[in-house]
Amino acid sequence: KLMKRNDWNMKPGEFHLTVIGIVQDLEGRFLVTRRNLDKEWAAGWWELPGGGVNAGEDSKDAIIREIKEEVGIDVSNAKGGHIYTYKNESPEEKNNYFVDVYNFVLDFKASDIKVQQEEVLEFNIATFEEIQNYEKEIGFLHYNSLKPAIDKIMKKQ
């Protein structure tokens, strides 16, 4: 079933698929972005690159596209892949979704990042401690849902 973009009028049992990319540099730091202040939802919060999966697209192609659109880097040949999926059910908001979480590790630096101006206020290549501080001070989108995936990554380092 196709749905209109941002049409959160889902019936029980209906879900849409979104993707999030945990992009890390070779030192294990995380590429994070801050949402523009004019966003209707979670304005100014920090987050990881990601978004919706388009009709006919698989989740890996979607996360590669979203990362390229939002921060201007190509992760198609990066080390890594799918590491985690979680489900969110919000019957009161009629917004149910699955999130496929990917982890990519590649050699990049701040000068390689070209943010999508309409979406992104700023970016950082952050340590996990910085991400924890963002969550406490400003807000970090999907932090609690992403914590198991980040913990899994941190154990490997």
Explain the meaning of each model-derived region.
Residues 48-81:
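The catalytic Nudix box helix
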